[in-house]
Amino acid sequence: MLGHNQNVVYQVNNYFNEKVQHRKVRVTKTVQRIAKVVQEILKEVEAQEPRFINTLSETTTGRFDGIVVHSPSEYEAVLYLNQMGVFNFVDDGTIQGCAVLKLSDGRKRSMSLWVEFITASGYLSARKIRHRFQNIVAQVLQTPQFSDYCKLLQDNTDVRVRVDDKYTVQITCAFRCNGIWPRSASHWPIAGLPWPNAALANQTKAEGFDLTSRETAITQQNNPNKQASSMEADAWAMKMHGAENMLLTGGRRKTLSILKCLRDAHMDFPGTPVTNYILKTLVLYECEKHCSEYEWEDPNIGDRLVGILLQLVSCLQCRRCAHYFLPSLDLLRSKPVHSIEHSAQLAWHLVRKLMIDPNALQSL
């Protein structure tokens, strides 16, 4: 598949127009269903606890702000909370990929909308808010309105709902942080690289990030240091989907869409560590290696696919995949070794076929 010829262009476009577009149509229909269910749940949650306001909204193009697609069966809905203003955002790198919200000097607890979730040390606890939200959702799902087609999964402290016994949606509480950039990502963009250009880099930084209340690989581990464990549980995980998406347009986004489809068909199994997010991360790293726009045009997408999949194999063999913006955060941390090894075998089988078979995409 390596090389630049019309056969590669034909295969890439044919695969995109048939399989990728079919996947998009299927996912779009599922998102409509997921969004409808989540909005109904949040309506009942808000009736019990007015501070949890439904922020999920449909755009003029039919997309939903706040819905993230992890796979055709795994989704996430982000519920944005209000009134972060009385807290200072503290990102000192102590907790990988996370930051804490500390009551500002001179501010009283009573000035916060979330007063009962503030710890004795003055931190707004992500864990306490998540626990409260989970309890309310559990009560809502026990009502006849939802009990037939919704079930709360209680394998961890995240609010994860099984819908129609086919789809899983995680509902995540978050604060939106526009116009600021985390200290942990201060190294970006890397000096001397032509991509992204200065204007795009500034737009990306202005997009900011989300602080989310969720279980992380750190909080899932049994930490013998109770004080550290408590601090990590109270911390907020940084998510940078908006900033990442701003960087992926045109051929870069097309490449990612093809990779997602290949992942679903050839690397998906229960507990797989190869997520859409890891593929997105590797595409971003590939953008730094191939900065010119022409390198992401149709004649070169075959080479980009092979390069990214080879990098995936390398990450799986090393059992480490660094977050693009927050490199101290390992996206493969705490993943079972046997799952990583199996994924490495699947990824190598896939990329090997792409390299040796000039018509590989016709059969994949």
UniProtKB/Swiss-Prot annotation:
Gene of origin?
A: mab-21
SMART domains for this protein: Mab-21
Biological processes, Gene Ontology terms: cell fate commitment; embryo development ending in birth or egg hatching; nematode male tail mating organ morphogenesis
Q: What happens when the gene is disrupted?
A: In the male tail, ray precursor cells show altered fates. Conical sensory ray 6 is absent as it appears to fuse with ray 4. Males show reduced body length and uncoordinated movement in a backwards locomotion. Hermaphrodites produce a reduced brood size due to a decreased number of laid eggs.
Q: Which Pfam families match?
A: Mab-21, Mab-21_C
Its recorded name reads Protein male abnormal 21
The protein's induction, as recorded, is: Transcription is repressed by heat shock.
- What keywords would UniProt list here? Developmental protein, Differentiation
What's this chain's function?
Acts in a cell autonomous fashion to specify the properties of the sensory ray and non-autonomously in the choice of hypodermal versus neuroblast cell fate.
Q: What's the source species' lineage?
A: Eukaryota, Metazoa, Ecdysozoa, Nematoda, Chromadorea
The similarity comment for this entry is: Belongs to the mab-21 family.
The record's section on InterPro entries has:
Mab-21-like_nuc_Trfase, Mab-21_HhH/H2TH-like, MAB21L/cGLR
